[in-house]
């Protein structure tokens, strides 16, 4: 069994904002190494229930072993958290007391060479979080049009050299398919002028991020998962999301603000006719970040941003 050595970020902050209590029902939509899940179970003892989602079967199995001491207080679901409403309905749960989404790729997935998430090692260009899914990064790289490749790399990677990288990919794949991570890295390095390489950022970072997001439909999943999670919250229940790059954080911020907004009528209309009521109260005006102590012991936490809401 793969050992998911994943250090959970912002552990104290997650518990403070989620505020688990005995008897509560909580969803960890991104179970991963089960670090946050264990904290939630301990805080909601003796009878709190945790439903853990992960589309990565390897992660789910490993988490199941780690959480075995909690027995029937844990329910595992192999599914993307975007479908949490449907999945919970299937097991008869209509409302929850809280949910957590810690989005993005896990340290273990990056370190598992054969998964193809990392540009540091040579491996098949895969990047699927759900290994039963059909589309791999290699398929996108070798089949998308130059225009679509450019759009994916620019929008999901926020890469200024997207057009040039897409053009170089097309040229290379006309000679031979791009099948491995390092083959793609070579193309990207050739496309991005050396003078534009950033000191602390590998030139392939943004393109690999973009492809991973596209392969796993991460942004749409986040938006759907957040909205679905809020709908399931009981009054006073809380939702917490941790993101690691600006695209994810922007979605969390926008979604939560929209759900917290009341009347959406134009200002020139003196009386509300839309009937829209706020669903949540935003608990974090600005995103919560890791302190210096955590960053020094877990550098990955440096880019973590936590936002939270409470159902009203």
Swiss-Prot record:
What GO terms describe the biological role, i.e. biological process, of this protein? rRNA base methylation
Annotated localization:
Cytoplasm
Question: Catalytic activity, per the record?
Answer: cytidine(1402) in 16S rRNA + S-adenosyl-L-methionine = N(4)-methylcytidine(1402) in 16S rRNA + S-adenosyl-L-homocysteine + H(+)
- Respond yes or no to whether keyword S-adenosyl-L-methionine is given for this record: yes
Q: Which enzyme type, at the first EC level?
A: transferase
| Keywords on record | Cytoplasm, Methyltransferase, rRNA processing, S-adenosyl-L-methionine, Transferase
Its main localization is cytoplasm
Q: What is its EC number?
A: 2.1.1.199
What InterPro entries does the record tag this protein with? Answer: RsmH (IPR002903), SAM-dep_MeTrfase_MraW_recog (IPR023397), SAM-dependent_MTases_sf (IPR029063)
Domain of life the protein comes from: Bacteria
Sections of the chain in a coiled coil = none
Tell me which residues bind S-adenosyl-L-methionine: 34-36, 54, 81, 102, 109
One GO CC term on file: cytoplasm
Name the Gene Ontology molecular function terms of this record.
rRNA (cytosine-N4-)-methyltransferase activity
Give the UniProt family note: Belongs to the methyltransferase superfamily. RsmH family.
Note the NCBIfam families from the entry: 16S rRNA (cytosine(1402)-N(4))-methyltransferase RsmH
UniProt name for this protein: Ribosomal RNA small subunit methyltransferase H
Whose protein is this, by species?
Geotalea daltonii (strain DSM 22248 / JCM 15807 / FRC-32) (Geobacter daltonii)
